[in-house]
């Protein structure tokens, strides 16, 4: 696999970019997660960043990438509405893994947003999308720009939802390379990695949560529910960071 030219690829239409990366992705599918990270660091341009929501299985990608690339900037977009357990989990993992944490937030505080727009998450899909744009998408775009990122690692997995089922290991999103090292891992592999490396699930895992985001749009799993139905009232799966 040869090195890729980000600028040249960004000039192509989206379909052509996908085709241009197809051969590389076919080879990346054959590598393990560590191999994919190592390949990306050798062949894709820096600066490198890793994003994390510090959700249920976040310790896996945080540990895996940070072991290979210590001090990689870890981007967290903090909405101000995370669970108390999440904030404590962030502190715990940051200390345990010696993370180079970079926290980005909306330019408007949570209270100011509610005063201006009301509770956007109660205003259907359009309200949720506006909320996500303000609290997730804009802060992430700002983070990528300020950190001069050209290669972005994330911990998405195909098993998590229908919207992620066909994602490749390597893509271009927001003008940068996006690498998903554990995209093909199942829940069993996640569990084994956590056990092997002395890592924990998010504290709310033990209380019945399969996915954790904001307090107002996250529900416990109940029999018959798909994982994606536990977020955003089942109206949508993605928070906006991994769309487009």
From Swiss-Prot:
Main location: cytoplasm
Record's keyword terms, sorted: Cytoplasm, Oxidoreductase
Domain of life from the UniProt record: Bacteria
EC number(s) per entry: 1.8.4.8
Protein family per UniProt: Belongs to the PAPS reductase family. CysH subfamily.
Compartments where located: Cytoplasm
Function: Catalyzes the formation of sulfite from phosphoadenosine 5'-phosphosulfate (PAPS) using thioredoxin as an electron donor.
Organism name: Escherichia coli O157:H7
Pathway involvement of the protein, from the record: Sulfur metabolism; hydrogen sulfide biosynthesis; sulfite from sulfate: step 3/3
Descriptive protein name: Phosphoadenosine 5'-phosphosulfate reductase
GO molecular function: phosphoadenylyl-sulfate reductase (thioredoxin) activity
GO biological process, one term: sulfate assimilation, phosphoadenylyl sulfate reduction by phosphoadenylyl-sulfate reductase (thioredoxin)
Active site residues of this protein: 239 (nucleophile)
Catalysis performed (reactions): [thioredoxin]-disulfide + sulfite + adenosine 3',5'-bisphosphate + 2 H(+) = [thioredoxin]-dithiol + 3'-phosphoadenylyl sulfate
Gene3D superfamilies: HUPs (3.40.50.620)
Gene name linked to the record: cysH
GO CC, alphabetical: cytoplasm
Tagged with keyword Phosphoprotein: no
Any matching Pfam family: PAPS_reduct
